Amino acid sequence: MSSERPDEEKPETRDVLRVQDLIHGGGGASPVQSPTRLGPTRFSEVAGDKILNTGSNCIGSVLSWINGDPNRNLKNPVKRAKRKRIRTAKTAAFVIVLVGFFIFVNWFMLSQLHEGRAWLRRGFSKKTNLKPKLNPDPNSSVKRVSVKVSANVQHKEKKKMGKPKKTYNGTYGRLLAYAAHALAEGQNKLEPKELWREPKDQALAWKPCADQRSWKPSDGKNGYIMVTANGGINQQRVAVCNIVVVARMLNATLVIPKFMFSDVWTDASQFGDIYQVEHFIKYLSPDIRIVKKLPKELQSLDLEAIGSVVTDIDVMKEAKPGFYMKHILPLLLKNRVVHFLGFGNRLAFDPIPFELQRLRCRCNFHALNFVPKIQETGAILVRRLRDSGSHLAPVDPYLVGPKFASFILDKKAGPLHKASKYLAVHLRFEIDMVAHSLCYFGGGDAEKAELDAYREKHFPTLANLTKTQKMPSPDDLRTEGLCPLSPEEAVLMLAGLGFSRKTRVFVAGANIYGGNKRLAALTSLYPNLVTKENVLSQTELEPFKNFSSQLAVLDFIACAASDAFAMTDSGSQLSSLVSGYRIYYGAGKMPTIRPNKRRFSDILLKNNTIEWKVFEQRVRKTVRQTKHVLVRPTGRSVYRYPRCKECMCNED
């Protein structure tokens, strides 16, 4: 495996936020870092006055109803007396209603408590329609009724207390043996057809159309926007497209983005090392003005001193356009330049105006082309994975460019040559994900000690939380589907779905936790398993040595071009971008497997008792339910769900 590389950010995903829901009963910032809002910032609003004003308005409404219109000029003493009587009557009515309401609430609560206590003392069900049937033997009748009532009470208590929790011991020896037997028996059988194709014809109706424009170019006269994006290469890609939208929104000129160096990813690659700068500038020129660097008169400014540096602490996650118009635009007009540091997920997906959302898609799917060096090596990788295939996938020209896409096509292959298919699996099981998940994977005390030490070093906030708060147990996290799939669980999923033992499997991922020993289950059941390090020679990999971001792009290309793609963590940014790319350019012919981890976990917890046929049926049903052709849900990522009117056009 390659050295650790940024195919993901530190695992601050939607699943991670659900861990906090279990801890606090609500949402919050990821425990990887300090909370997004540590307190009032320069862009904060004081909410206390709003709450006070709301309460005052409510009280004022009641007093206004009682007192009537204070602006009425009542000079007639008769009218004044009448008004006083009406006010007194209203006050009395209000007090009576209020007291009656409190009496009713108290009576209701006391009656419920009394009924519950009486039921517990009697030991009878709350249902009143349990009547014993007439029976000539009174003794047997009493026995049957008592047994029935007792069983009913026990059923109620069990339902109330919940099912006894099943614990995970980290081993799947029984199921893995069943899987090996099933794969050996099924070597000459046909695979299920739905494995290699989209199950719904509706997918064919969606066509890419984010390249269409209906507005005039922006002159960018309000100032300059700079961004230094953090995270891995996939988080940086999202940040670039988001900052393009912000630049258009503020009528600003965008300076070519920079990428922040991280001690975790240890890659100094910049935008121009991965993406074609000239294509980026030219393709987006009808949308925004882009320059390679600041004008000379602005280069000498101390941006931090003048308050033009905006960090992720200053901007809430998924901030709405109104935030940028209210807080960032005045700063931009004042200082002529604003520099965003980090900019991870700092722009909401809804509500966003139609054309701005389309610009987001246009940037991601059209403006970001990889540099020729990466395109060429990516084409070599795909060609070998397809075993010199005689066809091109719909995504190939967009991934590696028309020039290198033709290289994938084997011109020597005859018309009867059948290209071999390959399955790409993104196995998100690096130590950072494993440690951050707080899950247990069967490694005993040694595993716990190693992961504790890793959290202390890389996730100090999370490590402190584990010491100061009661955290969800590993079993609870697994039941909720919050644990990443281990290699053993991933291979059981593939076998359960019906992938043949002969299937070529490409594994994307770096430094799988546990090393080759952990991958033993995968390689033993699927011997045709490969990685980019197996497929490419050392000479071909040499230009990318020590550049983890560029190596991650090769994984992206291999996954996006695969005949079928399986993700093991739906919150992964690489999986999200790959699946979106396949939807946008795949013409309804490139299936993606998204396991529902909560349901899959429930199946795996029965590993000691479940039969293989039942396991297969349940796994296939679980995955089949995730393959529906859905329009993008409100608030979800357009990069992952491009089937929406802003990104794609529906011809139905």
From Swiss-Prot:
TM region positions: 91-111
EC primary class: transferase
Pathway info: Glycan metabolism
Protein's GO biological process: fucose metabolic process
A cellular component annotation (GO) from this entry: trans-Golgi network
UniProt-annotated location(s): Membrane
EC numbers: 2.4.1.-
Primary location recorded for the protein, binned into one broad class: membrane
The name this protein goes by in its record: O-fucosyltransferase 15
